[in-house]
């Protein structure tokens, strides 16, 4: 007798997370694939990410998703098939999967998701909006008739949802996230320290030293190319510089999204509660 395995999949532009029903088995890998000569897959997930920005001309390492939408369905399907193999065994074949999808998908984008998922060796597929999945994951009262707001800052997008009675009553998705913050760090380091760094270095600086309000004052030595001399160089970057760069991005974009969500659409929540 074969036991049916059930697992949830969180498809992000930067990371793919897969967990079983009891959360005992979890896979968390970078959503990235490395391909040689546009034909041969040589690495997926974290191994492909380690090759990012270091590959020769014949190898490309990139994510098959951009801004929460599928850019290369074939490569995304290959990554998912590889990762789902970790949930299969002699006694568990063709699992049931629940997949989170972004808000405000167009019909074409939704068909792209279905095409990728139906190509996997799975038994049943269910889709759930990211806002609802986020709220359930952090233990919010999603079935209550009161509104609960969830803000998910991803790599490429920021999703803002108001959940009530198990549904997304208000949902907005904005095309900026951690990648925009990383670009702000790259720009700041180039402008203030005359040093050119890559995205991976900027991400490490943001994660290690970035804060939006109050945080510990520290610094980190980073290496890159001097923008004037063109030779390898280094600079000590204080956490204040990192935090100012990402705070400016958050103030200009994320808070604007919150204000838009609150001021424009809260009347929909009141209408839903009175219906």
Residue map of PLM features:
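Nucleotide/phosphate-binding catalytic cleft detector across ATP-hydrolyzing
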Residues: 1-150, 163-275
């Amino acid at each position: 007798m074969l036991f049916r395995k059930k697992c949830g999949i969180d498809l992000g532009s930067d990371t793919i997370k897969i967990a079983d029903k009891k959360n005992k088995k979890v896979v968390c890998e970078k959503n990235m694939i490395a391909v040689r000569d546009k034909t041969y897959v040589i690495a997926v997930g974290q191994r492909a990410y380690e090759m990012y920005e270091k590959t020769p001309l014949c190898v490309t390492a990139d994510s098959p998703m951009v801004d929460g939408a599928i850019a290369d369905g074939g490569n995304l399907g290959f990554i998912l098939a590889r990762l789902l193999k970790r949930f299969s065994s002699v006694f568990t074949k063709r699992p049931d999967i629940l997949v989170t999808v972004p808000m405000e998908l167009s019909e074409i984008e939704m068909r792209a998701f279905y095409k990728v998922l139906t190509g996997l060796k799975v038994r049943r597929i269910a889709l759930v909006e990211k806002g609802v999945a986020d709220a359930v994951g952090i233990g919010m009262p999603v079935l209550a008739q009161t509104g609960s707001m969830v803000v998910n800052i991803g790599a490429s997008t920021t999703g803002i949802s108001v959940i009530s009675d198990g549904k997304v009553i208000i949902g907005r998705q904005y095309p900026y996230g951690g990648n925009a913050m990383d670009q702000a760090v790259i720009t700041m380091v180039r402008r203030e320290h005359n040093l050119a760094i890559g995205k991976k270095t900027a991400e490490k600086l943001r994660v290690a030293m970035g804060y939006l309000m109050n945080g510990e004052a520290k610094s980190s030595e980073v290496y890159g190319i001097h923008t004037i001399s063109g030779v390898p160089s280094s600079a000590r970057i204080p956490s204040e510089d990192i935090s100012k760069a990402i705070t400016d991005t958050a103030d200009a974009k994320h808070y604007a999204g919150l204000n838009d969500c609150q001021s424009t659409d809260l009347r929909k929540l009141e209408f839903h509660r009175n219906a």
